[in-house]
Each structure stands twice: as C-alpha cells, then as structure tokens.
Amino acid sequence: MSGAVHDEQWEVFVHDWLIVCKSDDYPWSERLGGAGDKGRDVVGYKSDPNVEGYSWDNYQCKLYKKSLGFSDVVVEFGKLIYFTLNGDYPIPQKYFFVAPYDLSTT
C-alpha cells in the first residue's frame, strides 16, 4: 500500500494541525500516542500542564478504514474514566475523536 498513512503519521498530522491552526486555544500541546498514552493521542493544553488543575482537551486519533463504532468509543471512554479516577490526569474539558470516516450508529 504505497502512500498509505499509518497511525503514527495520523497522530503527527493532527498534532501539527493543532500547532498551526489552534495555537491561540492551546499554548501547549503534546503528542502522546502509542503504548502507554493512557488514552491520549494528542493533547491541547489550555493552561500550564505542570500546574495542578490544568485545563486540557483530548484528541483521540483513529485511522480506521471504516466508521468508528460504539465498541471503539466505549473502549476509549473506559480508558478516560479509569485514568481520571486513578488520578493520572484531570478530566478533559473536551474530548474529540479525529477519524476520516465519521461515527457509525452501531
């Protein structure tokens, strides 16, 4: 599949978009994707992430060849619930799925 975009490239693209197009909203941003990201692929910080109680938005990148289904979303929300209750990070103000094929109803 020559020219195909891979998961990591998709996350880099989304992070670059955040830097170029959303820097007024997010003075800090970070790409965390991969194993150990705790359900956070790309993060836009509205306030300093080194200060307790910081404000942030999550961008969950999903490069599937089909629409995101309910089971895909549930897994990611499960991670969010687990890691926020565990105190790994505060609840994000907004949570976005960034996917090329929208969401399905199943």
Per-range role (PLM):
Residues 1-38, 43-106:
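Mixed-charge (Asp/Glu-Lys/Arg
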